[in-house]
Design a protein with these regions (language model features):
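Anion-binding (especially nucleotide phosphate/pyrophosphate-binding) glycine-rich loop
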Residues: 1-140, 144, 148-150
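Phosphate/pyrophosphate- and phosphate-bearing ligand-binding catalytic cores of soluble enzymes
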Residues: 4-5, 11-19, 56, 154-281
Length: 281
């Protein structure tokens, strides 16, 4: 376990701001997460839990404790009742998210291709319900393992318990700062059925001369290129990535807008709600 006083947070925020915290605690195992949890509980100082810090804007030094996961690695796990088309893989919460996508594509585990190049770590995927180009983490998450800060006990939550919705979860609300996430198990598919109808994916593929179904590798590379064309590399120019949320409106509101703006892009969320891209607005 790392325990550093007056620690720089330069490596833990994508804006590249060299603010400092009073104390930095980093855990690399479940046992270390339990130690960190009890320290957070007993020290009586304010604390925050960070990943890569893409949702963090530090305007001054933080007078408190910053906790971070360095739990790495992954392993396939068996799940009762799983069908032959499914593969379940548990990742440490400190693994870089895009490494998960790259590994899944390389191994023929499908479903994460559209989530390529999203900044952050595995733990954050379960908190934020990260998403892009018609895909969300909740569509892949099977369960989340964590340590309860109040007790140091190891707990786990099935995907339904986390109450995921658009960029939301219980970890952002009633469970905020109550758990240190240690592992997330994702359910991938061995069957490749890509979603190409969101945003300008098809146009970008057509520009490459691809009219049919792209390979998973080509789809991932195309998503990466689309994202890189919109946003600078945070390692070169500090930024928070795409942090906004696209508005979701009722069908009645959508129909009024569509009557005014016939070319307005939109995506059906459910029978009563439509998502309108904020970038178009």
């Amino acid at each position: 376990m790392k325990d550093i006083l007056n620690c720089s947070l330069l490596a833990h925020n994508t804006f590249g701001i060299d603010a400092r915290c009073s104390r930095f605690l980093e855990y690399a195992s479940v046992e270390e997460a339990q130690q960190v949890a009890l320290l957070l509980r007993d020290e009586g100082l304010p604390y925050i839990i960070v990943g890569e810090g893409s949702n963090l804007l530090l305007t001054k030094d933080y007078d408190g404790i910053v906790a971070h996961s360095a739990i790495l690695g992954c392993k396939e796990v068996s799940v009762d009742g799983a069908n032959a088309d499914e593969v379940y893989v548990s990742y440490g919460s400190g693994v870089t998210w895009d490494d998960v996508v790259a590994e899944s594509v390389s191994n023929g585990w499908h479903g994460a291709e559209n989530l390529s190049l999203i900044p952050g770590e595995v733990g954050a995927s379960a908190i934020q319900n990260i998403g892009a180009y018609g895909a969300e983490a909740k569509d892949l998450i099977y369960k989340v393992e964590a340590v309860e800060i109040a007790t140091g006990k190891v707990v786990e939550f099935g995907v339904d318990e986390c109450a995921y919705s658009y960029r939301q979860s219980r970890f952002k609300h009633e469970w905020k700062n109550k758990y240190l996430i240690t592992h997330v198990t994702y359910r991938f598919s061995r069957h490749y059925s890509p979603d190409l109808d969101y945003g300008n994916i098809r146009q970008a593929l057509a520009a490459k001369g691809v009219e049919g179904m792209p390979s998973p590798e080509l789809l991932r590379q195309t998503i990466i290129e689309i994202r890189q064309a919109k946003l600078p590399d945070p390692k070169v120019m500090g930024n928070a990535g795409s942090f906004f949320m696209n508005p979701i409106v009722g069908r009645d509101v959508y129909e009024r807008l569509a009557a005014q703006y016939e070319a307005m892009p939109h995506y059906v969320v459910d029978a009563d709600h439509i998502k309108i891209p904020a970038g178009w607005m």
